[in-house]
């Protein structure tokens, strides 16, 4: 059982990231309110390192399956971080050659509106309508119905980072584990990144014990069964 002090200091979101990452960038109000104020309930979590994201996944699994047991339901597969390959597959939304999750190579729609929360130019944090993070689902989803696979906050993946993982991973279900590698894969780009980092094929990393105001995560789960049988007909 983890001690309360350890959980509070190591696994809860670090609210000081807003001041540490961007001094005077509205840091004090966000540091005070982002994690706890109901006005931010629909915003993505930030300030969590890789370990904290994994701990939350385990915590979520435990409580979900306890609720299932209390209601006479079967346990679910565990929540976890997606592998880098899973994340990219999800981001592409079924479009193998998609530059961005919305499918096309363009950053604006026909009306000239940006298609994600990111920084289109030097110092330009405002053109997308949001100065920093945005509430989830403010932009259109990809063809899998997934929101914010590009921009808003970058996302932790399960994999350790290597400059080229192809020679060292199994091609059927590639994931790269290395407990001695402190760098972990981060994907998707964020509100403070330029368009390059929003690309579905763009790779990046952060150190596993680092919490940032522009990195969050989403959970994945093994799906039992298949979506349809049409591909076998």
Describe the role of every protein-language-model region.
Residues 5-204, 211-213, 228-233:
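Functional-site microenvironments in short loops/helix caps that host divalent-cation chemistry
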Residues 219-226:
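Short beta-strand-to-coil "C-cap" segments at the C-terminal boundary of structured domains/repeats
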């Amino acid at each position: 059982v983890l001690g309360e002090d350890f959980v509070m200091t190591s696994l809860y979101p670090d609210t000081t990231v807003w001041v540490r990452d961007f001094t005077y960038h509205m840091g004090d109000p966000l540091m005070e309110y982002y994690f706890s104020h109901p006005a931010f309930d629909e915003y993505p979590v930030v300030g969590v390192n890789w370990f904290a994201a994994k701990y939350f996944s385990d915590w979520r699994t435990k409580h979900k399956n306890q609720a299932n047991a209390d209601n006479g339901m079967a346990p679910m597969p565990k929540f976890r971080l997606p592998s880098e390959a899973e994340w990219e597959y999800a981001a592409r939304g079924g479009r193998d050659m998609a530059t961005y999750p919305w499918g096309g190579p363009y950053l604006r729609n026909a009306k000239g509106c940006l298609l994600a929360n990111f920084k289109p130019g030097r110092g330009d944090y405002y053109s997308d309508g949001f100065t920093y993070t945005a509430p989830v689902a403010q932009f259109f989803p990809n063809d899998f119905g997934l929101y914010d696979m590009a921009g808003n906050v970058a996302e932790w993946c399960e994999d350790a980072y290597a400059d080229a993982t192809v020679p060292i991973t199994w091609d059927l279900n590639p994931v790269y584990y290395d407990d001695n590698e402190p760098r972990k894969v981060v994907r998707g780009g964020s509100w403070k990144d330029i368009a390059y980092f929003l690309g579905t094929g763009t790779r990046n990393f952060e150190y596993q014990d680092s919490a940032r105001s522009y990195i969050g995560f989403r959970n994945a789960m093994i799906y039992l069964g298949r979506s349809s049988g049409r591909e076998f007909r």
